[in-house]
A protein has these predicted regions:
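Histidine-acidic metal/acid-base catalytic patches
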Residues: 2-24, 29-53, 60-76, 199-306
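Active-site acidic/histidine proton-transfer and metal-coordination neighborhood
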Residues: 8, 13-19, 44-46, 66-69, ...
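A generic secondary-structure micro-motif detector
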Residues: 57-58, 91-92, 130, 169, ...
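Short acidic/polar active-site loop segments enriched in Thr and Asp
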Residues: 78, 112, 150, 272-273
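Flexible loop residues that form catalytic
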Residues: 85, 121, 157, 252, ...
C-alpha cells in the first residue's frame, strides 16, 4: 500500500472511532456490507434516500468501462459520473454504435450511468469562446440523452480580471439559460458545479442560477471548504437548496468539513439522487479503498438525521 493509501485508512479508522465517542450515540444496527476489515462502529442507522456514486476524477481516471462497472459492483457504488478525457473514452465524438454499446453495458449492470462531467465554462470575456462552450454543451446533452443519463455537469472557473464580477455572473447565467434549453430538448439537466476561484462562493453560484432561471438548470454541490462558515454549511446550503440536483463529496475523514451536517441537510430536502465520491488521487488498492469509503459513507449517511 502506498503512503496515500495508508494515511487514508488510518484517518478513516480514527474518524470512525471519534464518531463512536460522541455522546448520545446508541449502539446497535446492522453490519456494514463488505467492510469487515475496517473497525467501523455499529450505530443506530437508517437507510438514506440518496445513494453513493463515483466520479471517475481521479480514482478511476485510468479505468475502462468494464473496470468501472466491475469495481463499482464489487464495492456497492451505485452510480457513476464519467469525467471527460479519461480512459473510459466516453466523449461527444462517440459514434452512434458505440453510444448504444455503452448504454447497454451500464443497463445490463447494477451501476447507473448518471451523468457526464464536462469542462464547459462560460466566463470568458471573448463572446466567441462562450458560444463555442455553449455549442459543446449542446452536444454533451445529445450524448447524455443517447446514453440514458440524467445530467451534464458544467462549471464556472473563476473571474476574468478584465471584467466586473457582476457582468461575469450575468454572462454565465445567460449562457446557462441557453444550455438549459438544449438540456430540456434532450430530456436531461444541466448541473452547475460549485467550482472555481471566487466563482465557487455560494452567493455567486446563487446569482448565476437566479439569472439563468431555467427549470432544467440546477447545481452540483461540491463540498468545498468555502461552504463552511463558523463550522457549519447551513447558510451556504440554504442559498443553493432550491437548485441542488447532484452532489460531489470527497475525503470523508476531513474534520474541517461537516459531513454529517451535509447528509442531514440532504435528507431534510428529500434528496434522492447521488452523492458522488470525487477522489483526487488514484489508489494502488482501489477495491480496498472503495470498501473503506463505502463503510464510512454508510456510517455517516445512515447516522445523519433530518
Amino acid at each position: 500500500m502506498n503512503q496515500t493509501g495508508r494515511r487514508f485508512f488510518l484517518k478513516a479508522w480514527l474518524a470512525s472511532v471519534a464518531e463512536l465517542a460522541r455522546p448520545g450515540l446508541e449502539e446497535g444496527g446492522d453490519s456494514l456490507a463488505r467492510a469487515s476489515t475496517l473497525a467501523v462502529p455499529q450505530a443506530s442507522v437508517s437507510t438514506p434516500s440518496f445513494k453513493l456514486g463515483l466520479v471517475t476524477y481521479n480514482l478511476a481516471r485510468d479505468w475502462d468501462i468494464d473496470t468501472i462497472i466491475k469495481n463499482c459492483e464489487l464495492t456497492g457504488f451505485e452510480g457513476v459520473e464519467l469525467r471527460t478525457t479519461h480512459k473510459h473514452g466516453v466523449e461527444i465524438s462517440l459514434s452512434k454504435e458505440r453510444r448504444a454499446d455503452v448504454r447497454k453495458r451500464f443497463a445490463d449492470s447494477r451501476v447507473r450511468l448518471v451523468s457526464l462531467g464536462t469542462t464547459c465554462e462560460y466566463e470568458s470575456p471573448d463572446a466567441a469562446v462562450v458560444e463555442k462552450n455553449i455549442e459543446e454543451t449542446r452536444r454533451w446533452c445529445g450524448l447524455a440523452q443517447d446514453l440514458g443519463c440524467m445530467g451534464v455537469k458544467v462549471r464556472p472557473n473563476g473571474f476574468p480580471a478584465s471584467v466586473s464580477q457582476e457582468k461575469t455572473l450575468q454572462q454565465i447565467g445567460q449562457a446557462l439559460a441557453k444550455c438549459g434549453d438544449a438540456a430540456r430538448d434532450h430530456g436531461v439537466e444541466i448541473w452547475l458545479e460549485v467550482h472555481g476561484p471566487g466563482t465557487q462562493l455560494p452567493p455567486n453560484i446563487h446569482r448565476m442560477l437566479t439569472v439563468a432561471d431555467h427549470p432544467s438548470v440546477g447545481a452540483c454541490w461540491n463540498s468545498n471548504p468555502t461552504d463552511v462558515e463558523g463550522g457549519s454549511i447551513r447558510k451556504s446550503f440554504e442559498l443553493l437548496k432550491p437548485w441542488i440536483r447532484s452532489c460531489h463529496i470527497n475525503d470523508l475523514y476531513r474534520k474541517n468539513y461537516p459531513w454529517r451536517e451535509l447528509m442531514t441537510l440532504l435528507r431534510a430536502i428529500n434528496f434522492n439522487r447521488y452523492t458522488f465520491a470525487e477522489i483526487s488521487e488514484p489508489s494502488c488498492e482501489p477495491i480496498r479503498f472503495m470498501d473503506y469509503y463505502r463503510a464510512l459513507w454508510d456510517y455517516t449517511a445512515g447516522e445523519a438525521r433530518p
